[in-house]
Amino acid sequence: MTTAINEAAKRAGSEPFYNNLQQFGRIWRALVIAQFADSFGPYPLNSGSGENPTFNSEKETYRFILDELKDAVNKIDTSITPTEDQAKCDPAYGYVADKWQKLGNSLRMRYAMRLTNTDMASEAKAEFEDACKGGNYIKSQSDMLWFKSDNGWNDYTSPYTRTWNLQALSSTMANLMTNLGGVSVAEQRADLAEYTKPNTYLGYKYDQHFVANTDNPTKQYWLDGIPENLDPRALKMFWLVNDTQAENMIDPSSKGTKINPEGSELLLDADGKNTIKISGSFTWNGVPSGASTSWSPTLSKNKLITTASGIRSCYPLWGKEYCTGGEEGLGRVVFYGAWESYFLLAEAAVRGWNTAGVSDEQAYGDGVRASFEYFGVGEYADAYLESTDYNRVGTSVKFTHTTEPSSFEATYIDGYTKQEKKVTYQYPVASKTLYGVALNDKLTKIITQKYLAQMPYLVQEAWSDHRRLGLPFFDLTGNESVMTGADMTELKPNSWESGQSWKYFPQRMRYPMSLLTSDEAEYNHALELLGGNNTTMIPLWWSLGSNQK
């Protein structure tokens, strides 16, 4: 891709439109290079030049990205209007110069913020402030960078349209959205009221079938219903099993699953015999982290999460528009959303940076509203932003509400005896989280909301925020064995007891082995710049892990 961009830049010529075209290409190239560098690490900046690629450090790469974006934006002539035929060649913006300029500034804000843990932090601050000072960045849906998608086999194929993928709600996402914002499910969908459960109820506990070795505060519970209060975006993102009235209903058969409303025999006894039927109909549960990472004595008896049919028939799945793609709405693949600019400004303001008069609270609220508008739930935004209710990991929405959560008495049902019992619900211990500061401070709120808004297309950005800040709260993999032969050898069965570490979360993607076979010298050079072996656990230069190792 960078080869084509470089070639286009060479051929641009001096005609004003083609000068703009060159700058648009440079902005797109910067985005592509950043995606590579944020996935793998060191990148060859002379890639696509016709020379043998030579890897550069991550610092050099980011310096190049920021310089390119600034220079390209400054060289765009916004007075140039493309012809109709020219506009057809740009599926994103139709070569509208002002939109590309906003994208360039927005990306500059994004990548400057990436460097807060590095020796370029002061430069990052200056870059960010310069990019946002004129207010010329992406603020509305009309300026967003997104593309149509479909479920075929072409350049517009959506990443979520493959029927064999297990695209189910995760335990992390379920905990974040439960009770967040205090908006009742009954208000959102009156027909779902009968399935709701009070916030103080945790569900059925199956401690013989779900792993205990994790810091997930809802571990081993199966909620036999929907939370009383749920973030309004949840039911737009995910389809509840057997919810035939949902606008985002998917055809279960398209996922290779026949759903049994009465439940499937999925929890086994020690002899491997079917013992308990579980129904996923109208329930809100997330697949536990690490459910398929290593052999587990406990999970070997749980077909609910160790089989594809169990997951697809019992857990909420990404809704119809994600599965089919589309030219409008949620089916479009987002590369930069309006909400991201606002959450970047909010974080910058919290850090004390100059955000051109935009306060942290204002930017935070605008980010939430932009996300709600995108998901079509804008009518709930005002009440949501005033909520002081905590989600399952101890974070509330209201920006000025920074009181840390306290444990509370909850009820549950023993899954084996069917007896109702009480338990003290414990939120994660703030000092033991990867962030390590608080569960409900302003930065946690900002990144929690940013994470939810970025779903599902901007997962790389969400991953980058987690690697950089340790936010939002990701529960540790429920691990019952030493993962011999895997990259995550530091994560032992009892690691969760002492708290989180960056060593327990993947930090990067591996370079493909084709690089080794095609250019062994540069492969070794890249690893030298990376500072470690070609594994997923080597922290990138800008990450929290690199700062702590």
Where are these regions (language model features)?
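C-terminal functional modules
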Residues: 300, 305-321, 325, 332-342, ...
